[in-house]
Amino acid sequence: MDAIQKLNDAIAKVAGGNDLYDTYKETWQYLLESYIGGEEYRRANHLVRYQLETEPEYQARLRTTPLENHCASVISVYNSFLFRTEPKRDLGSIENLAETYDFMRDADFDGRSLDNFMKDVATWTSVFGHAWVVVSKPNINATTRGDEVEAGVRPYLSVLTPLVVLDWNWSRSPSGRYQLNYFKYLEDVNKDVHTVKEWTNDVITTTVIDMGEETITDTIIEPNGLGKIPAVCVYNKKGVVKSIGISDIADIADAQRFIYNATSEIDQSIRLDSHPSLVKTPETNAGIGAGSIIHMPENLDPGLKPYILEFSGASVDKILGAIQHQVSNIDKMANTGAVRATESRVMSGIAMETEFQLLNAKLSEKADQLELAEEQIWKLFCEYMGYAWNGDIDYPGSFNIRDTGSEIAQLKTAAETSPNDPQIQKGIAIKVAEWMELEYDEDEVMPTTTPEDRPVHMQEMIMGGYEDAQILALHPEVTQNDINNARTALLTNQGE
């Protein structure tokens, strides 16, 4: 009995998490279900169960209730802006290493490039608030770097969600910097067989546990040649507790669950309106379907004749209004109202600009955290390769989020207000050309046209492929009417 108890204690120690893990585990699981959606969300039973509702009825309601996955939508919007422009990397002394080239193309030995890997890291940090990246290098007891190159050995990355990082501990170095001195995570799960890896500054311990048989089947201990734990905690936004970040969807997930339950209520309301309940005595024989016949006993009391049970719950319109209110709240929390809008919304120019600025600030903060994390990753990469990191990583710090349709409408109004002012027309033309991403030299000098030679010159520029915006920018004295007249004359001449 003592031996069995000792074994159970050993398994619990190896496979168990620390207090922070136990505290946040359910929250992390809920956030993961909210992001993934689909069958995972359905199995989590996030629908509120009715009183006296049987299990088959509840399961049927789960199967017929769709999920509007706002969590995934918001994170997708963030990532689309974050990685629209690739980060700039100056890798310094390791720029031309073959290992660096391979690492950039296949960062995790699973075919993902470093950019794609960092995009996954950004996704999981948005979901959980933080994620861990482990930089590993296989130990093959190579004596020279040539042996490692021949064997294809180089550092690679692994991203770990908080749900698999079971235990960790920080300590302060003499310089005051925090450093990990213990790190334990669940490396692999194959049915009942769990593989747990523990890192210290000196050794790496890999333990294989058969949870079904409750036995430890294998333990591998190897030296940690790096002398430190190569794990990087990547934050979405730092929280008050070290190693615990703030999720982007913590509050959005609750609103999404409300919408999920409200959608179920709409389904039930429609079903009750279309197929109301019939109250009758056991002796009354009622058919099923439209126009069915009801047979009542001849001696039935008139007060017991069948009748329809009227449904008096909340109307569908009221529930839809509540859902729309929650969608609006989600957009406010995520600062994505103007970006995720699927229909025209009444927003003033100042309100829209303010929302764009708030979204830009949020994205800039996320980009700064990714930039900091990638620099730490490259430092560990260099330590494995025997180099000192002297490079620089630069993620975009500002994101061009604009309502171009509104801007073009404003420019059109301005052009119609002052059609004969060449300076205003030129400024408008330049703005339109920027929006259209036209390439031309604004400082290019063009001879000023006269009313006599202007039509011919306009026709030459049109034939040369110049856009209207380019012509207006290069010739302040020209108006849009001049260009239209030249184009009309050109078409007439070609027709003749």
Predicted regions, residues:
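Surface-exposed polar/charged interaction patches
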Residues: 10-17, 27-38, 53-54, 77-84, ...
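N-terminal start-of-domain structural block
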Residues: 1-41, 199-241
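C-terminal helix-loop subdomains that flank or include functional centers
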Residues: 318, 325-496
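Extended, regular secondary-structure scaffolds
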Residues: 122-239
